[in-house]
Amino acid sequence: MFKISFKIFENDSVEEMELNGADGYFQFEIDNETYGIFIPEDIDEFSVSVYWWLYYFLKAVLILKTESYVLISDIEKPKIWIELIREENTLKISKVTADKPEGSGAIETKEMPNLIHHYWKDKQVSYEIFKTEVVNKAKLYIEEVRVLNNEANKDILTLESLILEIEG
């Protein structure tokens, strides 16, 4: 099982071209392990970028079509990564610690220095189930933020183009 949950926070003070609803709660669950926070109250201190988490997961789905290894950096935490390893149609997901060397990106396709499986390791889900959940939650997110934003918001268009690339 793989499940993504999110809740967006409205922000009345965003600039016209910025994305209203970019932040909120983001959590995913796999095999009884969860990552992220999802609580009923809206507490800004616990909010993260829902937009970037969905963007990175969509990018990972695309990369895993042709490659077998992806690391997604938790941009809020200094050494935490989510490791995705594809073997045939099985995806193994782990929460790991590793250095984030100068010049490394939020998404990497090679192992980072000093990578350690401190937390949970090799939680399995089929690639198709993972892909479907990521795409469906990204579509739901787009529906929710579209009502708060200009129709031609560049961030919404970026997510839509990634979804089209995955489904195409």
What do these predicted regions represent?
Residues 4-6, 28, 82-84, 91-93:
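Hydrophobic beta-strand residues in large extracellular and virion-surface proteins
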